[in-house]
């Protein structure tokens, strides 16, 4: 019965959150095997298998934190990188960039989509871990400033509503 059990990241969360934190999610019951196979961990990359629009197929998000047992639904592909050679944040940014090779594996039909087997074969740039970390530092600073500006704008709008819509 949905509504009880474990948190599940679905397509809605993926398309609403580039960086997925410990947010409210749908709860689903799971067997032990399902929990083992679908568990997400911090720094897992999640990709959309399909989308109604080609630009959404292969969309990448990253799990930033999970407090509870959290799993992903079958419309997503989870990638867990070896952090000794690959900075997950670097590849999150890489797959969001114009340099992403994702377009090469998107298949077009009624719904655009990607297959896990094609994602496994995708050839990607592999700069040194030091360069990956430097790139992540810069891009994370920019992302954090954008998030702060969005929050400031929301707060300003709330203040306007309080002042002018009494």
Where are these regions (language model features)?
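Basic, amphipathic alpha-helical recognition segments used for DNA target recognition
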Residues: 1, 15-22, 54, 65-133
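Solvent-exposed alpha-helices and their adjacent loops that cap or buttress functional pockets
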Residues: 2, 38, 115-116, 140, ...
């Amino acid at each position: 019965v949905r509504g009880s059990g474990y948190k599940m990241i679905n397509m809605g969360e993926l398309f609403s959150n580039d960086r997925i934190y410990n947010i409210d999610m749908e709860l689903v019951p799971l067997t032990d095997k399902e929990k083992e196979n679908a568990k997400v961990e911090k720094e897992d990359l999640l990709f959309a298998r399909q989308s109604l629009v080609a630009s959404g197929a292969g969309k990448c998000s990253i799990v930033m934190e999970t407090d509870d047992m959290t799993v992903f639904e079958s419309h997503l592909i989870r990638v867990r990188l070896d952090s000794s050679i690959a900075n997950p944040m670097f590849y999150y940014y890489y797959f969001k960039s114009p340099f992403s090779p994702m377009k090469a594996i998107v298949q077009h039909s009624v719904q655009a989509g990607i297959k896990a087997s094609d994602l496994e074969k995708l050839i990607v740039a592999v700069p040194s871990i030091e360069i990956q970390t430097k790139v992540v530092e810069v891009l994370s600073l920019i992302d954090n400033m954008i998030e702060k500006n969005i929050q400031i704008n929301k707060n300003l709008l709330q203040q306007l509503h309080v002042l002018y819509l009494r």
